[in-house]
Structures are given as structure tokens and as C-alpha cells.
Amino acid sequence: MENPGASQADHSAKFCQWIRICEWILLALLCAYFGARTLPRAWRTLNTDFPNYYLTARLTHEHYDTSRIYEWMWVQRQKDHYDIDQRIVGMVPITPFSTLVVWPLTSMSALSAKHYWLALNLVLLVVTLALLRSMTHLPWRRVALVAALSFPLQVNFLLGQYYVLLLFILTFSCWLYVRQQQFLAGILVGLASGLKIFPILYLVYFVRKKDLKAILGTVVGCLGIAAISLLVFGWQLNHTYLTQVLPAALRGEALNPYNLKAASLSSLLHRLFLYEPQLNPHPALNAPWLFAVLHPLLQMALIAPALLLVVPKEHCPRRDRLEWAAILLVTLALSTSPASYLFTLLILPVCLIWDALEQQRDRISIAVLMSFYFAVGIIGGSDHGGAGWSALLKVPRLYVLILLCVFTYLLLIRQQPRERLKLSLSWTVALIIATTLSIATNLRHQQGLYADYQWRIFTPHDVYMAAQPVVEDDTILFIAFMLDGYHSAVDHFDTVQFSSPSHNDYLAVASTGSERWVEQVGNTSTVVPVNMDKAGIREAESPVVSFDGRWLAFLREDHGRARIWLHALDQPNNSDRPLTPTVLNVLEMAFLPEGTLIFSAVSESQPRLFSADQSGNIRYLGIDDARYPSVSPDGHWLAYSQLDGGNWNLWLHNQDTGATHRFTHVACNNIEPAWAEDSQTLIYASDCGRALWFTALSRRRIFP
């Protein structure tokens, strides 16, 4: 007679054997796809992201002044000069320190550097999988299968991103932590926070855990990274990151905040409740206060369980791994700029959670976990048809991530001893206070932020940035950042014409009224006349023409530092001559009617306003933290932007009396003023309600 128990065990063994066979087959197919499809494509082309890191590291390696690396047009100019085969580059919101990971590769071409980078990533991936295998009870095939099923990992290799490196660091840190090497684990968390800011949430985890060694290690790691960043890049760039880039990134405004393809909580709430004339003309409800309240409230609703479910002062490897997974999952769910490759990091928490479920032999939960994991990798968001409340249907990845967090929290609750299932009053109060402060900060940030819309000039939908306006009678000339590069543009009564598509970028424009000049950028910058048979000026940037049309001033750069040079338009055979000393790094300039130049230049560590006459006599004007000078045609007024609290606002200086007063008072950037011919109206670039420095043009009458 057949033994029912033996028969059942036999069936179970056969089922497990078939599962193993299927796993090996799937792993082999996925690895074959990676080797035959993904890796060759990554090897042949630069794609979008690797050039950002490579260019910054190379400029630093070659001793350039990199204090302006976050300025889109400045870094685009450097990219063109180095002939890097990538249409658009930009550093926002990348940390300065993260670019140093490719420092050793900057002696070679960009594509060759990417080859070495890909090889290093393959090695790091194998080491990471070995650490995961060591940390869990999962067999090699399952650890490898988790990685092979990661579509974000494929994208990471295609674009040359650094998330395999970040995955390795966080995995190694977790491996050390569960082995009671808390100080070293904390140092690695500090290192990870230098690459991407969100791992700093582990510091809060360590505080909740009351783990002094891990706290100390994280602080030491962060201080070490800060010291290296200051030593390599200097104070100015790091200050720009901390006071301008990072706050915008935390609000979800480092890049287009209304883009539902990001599928982030921030982009969804921006789309639902914040009106913007060009980027979001049809929100579900124009209620900025709702965004200010709901964003921190919903963020805390996700973060709080991950922290409150932590068991303080207790180190159990099984429990620590789950807590580690929960913290990483919630940081990914709350990311304000979650590109697909970010979710390469899911490999770590998914392996840790799978291991916990495998020990419980909970196959249904494993199936749910892997379904969530696969869905996060292949779905994102859609920006098509997301007007009004329909935006709620356009971010499926966000909902799957939230479900994955809830799934992990339930697992933590299930594994937590009953006597531990009680809220920490002090932590609950602290989280409520943090949420309240965040809401108050948001409401304060919004004061007057959207008033600028009433003065906005029409901007075509395909223009991401309109900048550097120049007034010519009833026409506005400006530079337009579009999908295929930077164009010169002409706006005549809301009819906009763009320069023809070209391999070169157009990064500046100037006008005498009868003549127009543009900066055309390829291997070098050349200021060329438009529709005229005059010769261009090589190695020249950012042209400005005097009121009488006799002089053209331009910048000539050497290793990222620029001087003013003068070119005589009425005597073109005369040699161009420098006007400012090398000790000043000139940023922008404007002519006074009599021919004197007012310019902004970095002296010591901050930009200041100076004047220079035709003989080169320099005079400091006593105005600090100031850029973008512009003189009215009647010579009575100087407009400029001054930095205060991380924002550039417009100021007016009376040239006759010396009096100054602030013209705008908002927590955004109003820059690059240009005067209309009546000397009563300003056209300027504003990023209020938009992504950081992705400006639109506004026209505003100054005097009644």
C-alpha cells in the first residue's frame, strides 16, 4: 500500500525540481539577452547620463574652474568644446562628489572611459551578488535571477549610470551591519550619501535604533565626503548645491516637476494642484496650499511605519535585514526624481525579503513580492492625457512601490514580538513636529511664488527653457533650450521663430538694432553675425553690443575663467584687446550709454559688480552676491539679480542717486533682466513655478 506521506513528499520534490529547472532556464535566457543585446548597445554609445559625470570629472582633472557646472548653458558649452557625442548634458541634481567616481578614467575619450566603467560595473555586480548570497539563505541562481529580472539594471548599463556602485556600497554596508560592524557600515552609508542624498535616511534609522557606533560612522563618512568635495571643487560649487540645487531636488523641482513619466508622489501632486501656464495649464484643482500640506503629510505617512517598526537596541540579523530593506524601499518610493535606473537598488531589499519569506515557506507571498518587483521595473508613468484628475491613473509604478512598502511593513509586524507592538510616544511626537515644520516651510516658500504668471510671455510648449532675452524694437531675441539642443529664437508679437537645427548650439545673442550676433558653439565658441558677410570672432562667448553700435564686448575663457575682450565694430581690422585682469572671473556684462562696462565677476568666492572704462580701469561698485547687470537705454537705471537665501531676485540701482531697492521678493529665481527701449519695462527670465533654472520669459513694467 502506498504511503500518502511519501507520495506527497515525492510530488513536492518533483515540483521543486521543476521550479529549479525553470529558474535556470529563465536565468540563462535573461543573461543571454543581457550579453547579446544590452551590453553591446551600452558599449557602442554614450547615451545620456555617463557624459554628465565624465565631463565634470574631466574638467576638474584638468584644473578648470567648475563653480558654474550646475548652469545648463555653461556646461553645454564645455561639452561642445570637448566634442562629446551627446546632444544635451546637465549636472542638476547630481552631487559634485558623485562625479569623482569616474575621475581615474578622464585621461581617455568619453566612450573609452565608458568601456572601463562598464567592466567595473560588471565586477561590482558579481561582488554584490556574492554579498547577497552570503547574507541570505538564497541559492546562487535565485540571487542572480533577481538581478537578471531587473529591467532598471539593464537601463543602468545602457546609460552608464552609477547605481550598480551604489547598490554595492549599500549591500556591503548591510553585510557589515548584520555582522556587528556598525561603525564601518555607517561610514559606507556616509559614502553612499555623497553619491545620492537619500541614503542619509539610514542615519535616522541608526538614531531610532540607538546605535551609537553606526551614528558615529555615518557622521564620520559624511564629513569625509564633504571634506573631499570641498577640497576638489571648492566652496562655491558646494554652496550652490546645498543652497540651490538640493532644496529644489527635495521639492521635486530639480527637473520638470509636472512630468508624470517620473511617476513620483511629487510629480503627481504638482500635476494635480499646481497651475503653470506652459507646463501644467489644466490641473485638477489650482490649490497650491494642498500641495504644501499633502506632500509632507503623505511622505511622512510612508516613512513613519518604517521608523516606528524598528526595534531599538536589539541586533538580530534576520530582523536587521528586514528593517534595512524597509528603509531602502521607502526612500525609493519617495524619491522626487525616480528615473527607471534608480530601481536597480531594489535588488537588495527584494533579496532580503525573499530570504525572510523563504524561511517561512510562504510561496504565495514570494509570488506577490516578485510580481511587485517585476512591475516596478517595467512600468513607470505616462505624461500623455494627464490633465485634471486623470493624472491619478498615470503613475502606476508609484502605487506598486507603495504596495511593496506596505507588504514589507506587514512582514515586519508579523515578525515583531507582541510586547514590542506599541508606538514610541517620543518618536511619534517628533515625526508630527517634523511634518508640521515641513508644511509650514512649504507654505512660506509659496508666498508670492505664482504672481509672476501674470507677466509671462508666451512660450511654445516644446521650449524647455527660454533665457538671455535681448530687446530689439518690438522683438525679443532669446536662447531656447529644446529637445535637439540650444537655438537662437525671435519672438515678434508672440510669433516665435527658431534657428534651423544644427550640430552646433547657439548659446548667446546680441543686437545693435540693425545687426544681430550669436554665439555659435562647436569645438570652439565663435561670435558670428546673422545674415551678414562679416567675419566671426573665434574663441568668443556671450557677446554684448554698446548702445552706439561701435563696440562688441565678449568673454574669452581659459580653463573655465573668463575675461572681457573688446572688438571695435567700426574698425574691424584692429586687434581685439582684453579689458579685465585674469584675477577676475567675469560672468556677465552690460554697457552704459557712454561706453563704460558694468560687469559681474567672481572675486575671492562670490560674484560682485564692477565697472570698467575703455582704458581698463576697474572699480568695485560695492554690490555683493550680484549677477546679470543690465543698464536702461536712458542710463538712469541698473537692474541686476542678487542672491539671498538661495534665490536670485531682481534689484534696481538708481545711477543718479545711488539708491537701490529690491524689485522681486519670491523664493525662486528672477534673472537676466533686459530693458525695453522705453527704460520703463523689464524683460527677464523666471523659474517661478518651474524646474530650477528652466526659465520662461516675463515682461513687467517697472514704473507707472
Predicted regions and their residues:
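Primarily membrane-embedded glycan-assembly and transfer machineries that use lipid-linked glycans
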Residues: 2-184, 209-340
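Transmembrane alpha-helices and membrane-interface helical segments
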Residues: 127-131, 168-179, 205-210, 214, ...
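Membrane helix-loop boundary segments at the extracytoplasmic
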Residues: 160-163, 335-345, 376-393
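A cytosolic-side transmembrane-helix exit/cap motif
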Residues: 163-166, 186-189, 236-243, 344-348, ...
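Transmembrane helices and adjacent periplasmic/lumenal helix-loop junctions
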Residues: 189-206, 334-345
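Extended hydrophobic-aromatic, low-complexity segments
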Residues: 339-344, 356, 363, 649, ...
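Aromatic-enriched
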Residues: 352-446
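Sequence signature of WD/YWTD-type beta-propeller architectures
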Residues: 423-704
